[in-house]
Amino acid sequence: ISDGKRVEKVRLFIDKLGTTDQERVQNSVQRLEYNLTDALHKFTVKKQKKIAILRSNGTLEDVYLYDFLKTAREYYFIAPFTLDSVATNAEKTLKDLEKFDLLLVAKPTSPFSDEQKQVIDQYIMNGGRVLWLIDQVNVSLEDMYKTGGVTMAMPLDLNLTDMFFQYGFRLNYTLINDLYFSEIVVATGDGSQSRYMNIPWVYNPMVLSSNNHLINSNLDAVRLQFANGIDTLKNGVKKTVLLSSSPFSKADGTPREINLRIDPKAMNKELYKKGNIPLAVLLEGEFKSMYKDRVRPLELKENATLSRPTKMIVVSDGDIIKNDFDSQHKMPLELGFDRWTSKYYDNKAFLQNAMNYLLDDTEFLTLRNKKVQLAFLDKEKVAESVRAWQIKVFLYPLLALVIVMLLSGYFYRRKNIKKV
């Protein structure tokens, strides 16, 4: 679609993993109205809401957030934000943060100071929304490739445990081991003899949506990498599990050694009976400040102890938002695309839904999740009907010929009898 100045691509065909041709047509028609409306909306949208992208505490670099932020910029104002200034002017840092409607925290790797936590806490108390994408275990495939396929998975302390506990959830220092997994590609051999092969990777769960909320409705599989388990706690805040591991999964404790060579005996289904572990949770309501009954590290002008009605989402995998980077062509790839297996996952759609919901843009969410039921032909009935017509086409002419022959014989005999 073009308005003369810019062109927007409209995706007409939705090719989901593991779907039949009939299901692909159903999904494509179901999303057609939204895709067309969304493209037209981009020509007329007037940005109002603002998203702060945390740029301190070792969060993901821009190159790995590129595709998601490119999409988000079409609807919202996007700006980097750092908490480094808390040490020199916490009051100003808080005021600057409160200019934003949403704070995105994508895979921090260094601990938060108590002062930084208080600023975020007061931002939430004043109605700010947060999308937490957090890793509680330090491990990556890149490290494994560099060390011959073996590495140690170590707990990662971000100094956020007490804060999360007060808000109603706990991120565990575990790795989700799931028999419903995605594959990774490893190289075998040296030099020109190198071969690439797909291997099962139980620490990359392929998560199917339970379709229990606007955020996760009509999604294809979402791929996570080294995800951690989430516990929800009773504190009066409404909680909705958006993503969870399969029934055939378990939580492996850390520290532990991770090896690319997975023993098939260790993948016995009998060992995977404690599944359905929460991996992404929506929390809504009035949150209690983590400093309600504690000594505050900062003396701010406002120190609210109970938040306005607000909401946040926590995902136990910082890599859910990370797009791959093509080093050969020096360009970021589309979020959710696995260049090694050429498969697409719905990470971007899930995060876009989460962002829309946190910012109260539910109209597009409703349209995106609109269900259209197509009346497909019943293949068995069609086959039976075809056979019936084939029989009729064969028998009717034959029957007509027999009738004509009988009538001809009858009239011929009658004519001869009259002559006699």
Label each region the model flagged.
Residues 1-420:
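Short, surface-exposed patches at the edges or C-terminal ends of soluble domains, predominantly
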